[in-house]
Every structure is written in C-alpha cells, then in structure tokens.
Amino acid sequence: MSSILDIDLDYFRFLTRPLERLNELLGWAGRPVDAVFDHHQEALELWNDAIQKGVIRCPQFILHVDEHHDMMGERPPVSSGNFVYFAMRRWLACSVHWLVDMRIDSPNQWLSAEAWESVAERFTSGSRLPRCWPKPDLVTVAISPGFLSRKLRDRLMKRIGYIRSLPARKVL
C-alpha cells in the first residue's frame, strides 16, 4: 500500500496562517518533500516514475492539498486542471481526499455523469485530514506560478527547504 501527499502551493493563498498550516501538513507527513515542480500535472508523471523505479507501489491513497480539485474534465490531454481524474482512472484502487478550506465547486460539475460515477465512491473532500489516513510514502509539491504572490511562494518554499536556483524537479 502506498500513500501520496500532493500539495499545490495555491492552497495556502487565502489562509490566514499559511506557514503554520504547511508546518502541520509536513509534520504529519513525517518525511521531507521528495519533489517540487512548477506545473501540477507533472505530479502524475513523477508518480509513475516513482512506481517504475520501485520507490512506491501503485498508490491507494492520495491526499490532494489544493485550492482546486483538478478534475475539470475527462478528455486528454492531461493538464493541471484534470490530472487527478486521470490518476484515479489509472489506479482503480486509489482513493483521493481533496483537502480544501474554501470549496469553490465540485468535480461532478465538470465531469460527465459516467466519468464522475467511475470515481465518485473513491473521492472525498473536506477541510480536515480524514481519520486513519495513512502517512505518505511520497510528498510532492507544485509551485503553480501565477496563483500566489511571490512573497508567499518564497516563504513557503523556504519552509520546504527548496532553493529556486535548483532544478524544478528533484530526482527520486
């Protein structure tokens, strides 16, 4: 069983105490961030690489910490707006919890009835970590340029321990 903590920094932009929330999440994870990248859809490729390299098994749990659910359609190509749907279709035993404080919409508004039905039982959302959710075997962070101020981004990245001059993707 593998579990992934998937964080998009845009999640923190409307929080009154963003660094404290990031500290809570990383403290709960109990492990360093494994990879940082600019665009959130890069997570899916990285997760596949981690599976192929034997770093993790096919995920059964993804904690998706994001301002958006990233299930805005079921048609290719994979993008930042829909990659969670494609992850759920690829790994049929994978449950996703969308950790969100201010829910602006729902995946069922964007997916066809058939597409939503194929993932709905494995998708939950809320502002709290589900009870007994397994700690992650892999932690990934999307910077998502343009979604938050440079000042906040830099503060969050400093907490993560990431230096912007390094490549956007760490090697697993």
Which residue stretches match the model-derived regions?
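Conserved alpha-helical scaffold segments that buttress catalytic/binding sites
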Residues: M1-L172
